[in-house]
Design a protein with these regions (language model features):
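Short linear motifs embedded in intrinsically disordered, charge-biased segments
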Residues: 1-207
């Protein structure tokens, strides 16, 4: 494998910062705390709020540039505006959502960012005091968190169908040794979408 040493970075993911020294042909590889991969910021501390905020900022910037051209255009049909939102805006906010754990904070951030665009599409503001559920119903849009939960479930089913020697399948079914630290544990990926009905579905798949 050939790599570009000037473009290659190394990063460790751990609770406490770790020093990682890699040398390729007498050239040290720079260690970083954060880097961008396919438009997504990945940090060594794995802060889901920080990573998601970067995606939302990009989606908001694009949505703002379309405000006068598309969202507030009285000559464009609402369903066309919604189709543009689904195609151009939502994928930016939800990129990698299938493998990211959700917290109360990240769910709130996604819903706020989505409703900001949907209110503009529907020609409403907060002063109109229209419920978010009513605006989503008028636009024919499913709640972004529920939509993401379905994507997680689809990814879970996809990984379960993989061979047992595939890395995603190994990671999904692996239980790391040791115990979790005291206090409230970090949110796990499975905790983001499992509920009573979903756990029942999981048991049926295992059987």
């Amino acid at each position: 494998m050939n790599i570009s040493i000037s473009k290659t970075k190394c990063m460790t993911i751990a609770k406490d910062p770790l020093r990682c020294k890699l040398v390729v042909e007498d050239n040290p590889i720079e260690q970083v705390m954060q880097f961008r991969y396919l438009g997504v910021d990945i940090s060594s501390t794995h802060d889901p709020v920080k990573d998601l905020r970067s995606q939302i900022n990009k989606a908001s910037a694009l949505s703002g540039s379309l405000r006068d051209i598309v969202w507030s255009n009285p000559y464009m049909r609402k369903d066309s505006k919604v189709r543009i939102y689904k195609t151009c805006i939502r994928p930016i906010m939800t990129y990698g959502m299938e493998v990211r754990e959700d917290t109360v904070k990240t769910k709130h951030m996604l819903r706020v960012a989505e409703m900001k665009t949907l209110r503009t599409i529907g020609g409403k503001t907060k002063r109109d005091r229209v419920r978010n559920t009513d605006i989503r119903e008028q636009c024919g849009i499913q709640d972004i968190v529920r939509w993401g939960r379905q994507r997680k479930r689809q990814w879970y089913n996809h990984v379960r169908r993989m061979d047992e020697n595939r890395l995603p399948r190994i990671v999904l079914e692996n239980n790391p040794p040791g115990s979790r630290p005291p206090g409230r544990p970090p949110k796990r990926w499975k905790d983001s979408w499992q509920s009573t009905s979903q756990e029942e579905m999981q048991r049926q798949l295992q059987n």
